[in-house]
Amino acid sequence: MYKKIFKEIKKYKIIVIARHIGVDPDAMASQIALRDSIKLTFPEKKVIAVGTGSAKFNFLGKLDKLEKFNNALLIVTDTPDRRRVDGPNVDDFDYAIKIDHHPFIEKFCDLELIEDTATSACEVIMKLIKNTGLKCNKEIAEVLFMGLVSDSNRFLFSSCTAETFNLVSEYLDEYKFDISPLYQQLYSRPLNEVRLEGYISLNMTVTENKLGYIKITDEIINKFGVDSASAGNLVNNFNFINEVLVWATITEDLKNDQIRVSIRSRGPGINHIAEKYHGGGHKQASGVKLKTFDEAMELMNDLDKFLAEYNSKEETLENGD
C-alpha cells in the first residue's frame, strides 16, 4: 500500500493535504510533515496543507490557504469519515487518498491506508516515509515525533508496541533530534490552565462504578481565561486516579453552538458508546459533539451503566466464578 500511495504522489503536480475538523497535534503534525516530506522529495510540486489551525500548535508549522485547483490529488490524514474533513470537498479532486489510524467508519477516498493498531497518523506517515522514496530531515522527524507522542499520550496507550518503539528509535538515530525541547513545546501550559485543572479535580463527579466527569460551562471557561478546546483537552491529565476507570470532560463551546464530550478509559473500550451518540474514536479515547448538557448526561448515564456491567464481569472473573 505504501508503494501505491507513493506512485500516486509522483503522478500529480498539485497535492492538497487535509485532516479532520477540531485540530489536534497528531492531525496537524501528520499533514505538515507529509507536506514537507513531499516538497523535499519533489521541489517542483505545489503541495499545501489546509484546514483551520490553532495558535496553540503553531510550533508544528504553518498551514496554507485552500485554493481551487484542477487535476489535483487530495490526501486526507487522521480522518475516518467524510463529514469530518476540514476544508476541501473530496469530490473536487481527481484522486483522493486516506491515511488514517482510526477504526474504519466509511470509505470516501479512492485509495485508503488504515492502520487501526497504530498509535497515531504520524506513526503511519513515518512508516510511509521509511518504506518509499519520500525524503525526511531533522525538522520533519521532530514534527512526526511530537504528533506520535501526543496521540499516544507519551507512549501510555496499549497501541504502543515494539514496532512503535523501534520506529521511533530509528528516527532518533538517523535524524539526531533532541526530544527534551519537543516535550516542552507540547506540554508547557499557562498558569490559568493549571488552575482550571485544580478546579476539575475538586469538582469532578465520581460514581460508584468508577465513572468520573466534569461539566465545564462557558462561565467556567471565562472565569479561568482559557478557550473551550484547551479546557476539553485537560481530559488527558486525569489518567491515574484509583477511583476512576473512565472519565470525561463535558465542555460548552458557544462559538460553535455545541457541547464537546471527550472520553478516556484505562480499561474497557468506550468507542461503541460514543458511536451511539454519532461520535467515535479509539477504544480508550473517543469524543462526541452534542447540542445540550442534557444529552451529555444521557451519555454519562450510558457510560455508568456500561461500567456497572463491566465491573461486575471483572469481579466474577477475579472470583473464578
Describe the predicted segments one by one.
Residues 63-65, 86-88, 112-115, 133-135, ...:
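A generic local secondary-structure boundary/capping motif
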Residues 67-68, 89-91, 105-106, 136-138, ...:
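Solvent-exposed alpha-helices and their adjacent loops that cap or buttress functional pockets
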Residues 1-4, 78, 129-131:
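Short, motif-level signal for alpha-helix interfacial/capping segments enriched in acidic residues
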Residues 2-58, 65-72, 150-321:
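Hydrophobic helix-and-loop "lid/oligomerization" segment in the mid-to-C-terminal part
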Residues 33-35, 91-94, 114-115, 166:
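Glycine-rich, phosphate-binding/catalytic loops in enzymes
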Residues 58-111:
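Active-site cofactor/cluster-binding pocket
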Residues 49, 76, 98, 113-115, ...:
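Structural signal for conserved beta-strand scaffold positions within catalytic alpha/beta enzyme cores
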Residues 102-170:
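Short alpha-helices
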